Curated annotation (Swiss-Prot):
Protein name as catalogued: Xanthine phosphoribosyltransferase
Quaternary structure annotation from Swiss-Prot or TrEMBL: Homodimer.
Species of the source: Brevibacillus brevis (strain 47 / JCM 6285 / NBRC 100599)
The keyword Transferase is assigned to this record: yes
Disulphide bridges: none
Subcellular location as annotated: Cytoplasm
Gene: xpt
Length: 196
């Protein structure tokens, strides 16, 4: 997605060869117009898949899941990192290690909202090590739901996340694939034509 790549170059900050800060427009201060375009693009990429739910993890994936679910006309669910006192029913859960926070969470989704009848699209802000997305795919599998695919807003293609998901047979669509990055610049893998 060209507009997203341009914003990453313009407003993103490379903190190291593996850390990209995009909080000026994606995951702290949020550009709502760009967010809605991202959701529309995911809806286009996964059109015809009869998706019934969009799933993400709190917090940085929520607005992308909302925009995508809005474009698809279906509900979205976000996995919680900590079990709330209001979450009294049974849950699906999986451990997830956060690269940026260096913490491991036990994410959970209520069994009430995810079932074997669902066709699920997972959406998140980053695909890097793949830990969050693998955790979410495990929850979808535990529910017996059909995983249609994963949509990542930004992919750090030089990290192992894509490989882990591909080994599991997961379809991945990333809107900005970064081949490499340094304070001197960001190199993208060029977009491939969308599947029809």
């Amino acid at each position: 997605m060209k507009e997203l790549q341009e914003r990453i170059v313009q407003d993103g900050k490379v903190l190291s060869a593996s850390v990209l800060k995009v909080d000026a427009f994606l995951n702290h201060q949020v550009d709502p117009q760009l967010t809605m375009k991202i959701g529309q693009r995911f809806a286009e990429l996964f059109a015809g898949e009869n998706i019934t739910k969009v799933v993400t993890i709190e917090a940085s994936g929520i607005h992308f899941a909302m925009a995508t679910s809005f474009a698809l006309g279906v509900p979205f669910i976000y996995a919680k990192k900590k079990k709330a006192v209001t979450l009294t029913e049974e849950v699906y859960s999986a451990p997830v290690h956060s690269f940026t926070r260096q913490e491991t969470y036990q994410i959970s989704v209520s069994r009430q909202y995810l079932s074997k009848e669902d066709r699920v699209l997972i959406v998140d802000d980053f695909l890097a090590t793949g830990a969050a997305l693998v955790g979410l795919t495990n929850i979808v599998k535990d529910a017996g739901a059909h995983l249609v695919g994963v949509g990542a807003v930004i992919e750090k293609s030089f990290q192992e996340g894509r490989g882990l998901l591909e080994q599991a047979g997961v379809r991945i669509e990333s809107l900005a694939r970064i081949e490499s990055m340094s304070p001197e610049g960001i190199h993208f893998i060029e977009e491939e034509p969308a599947r029809v």
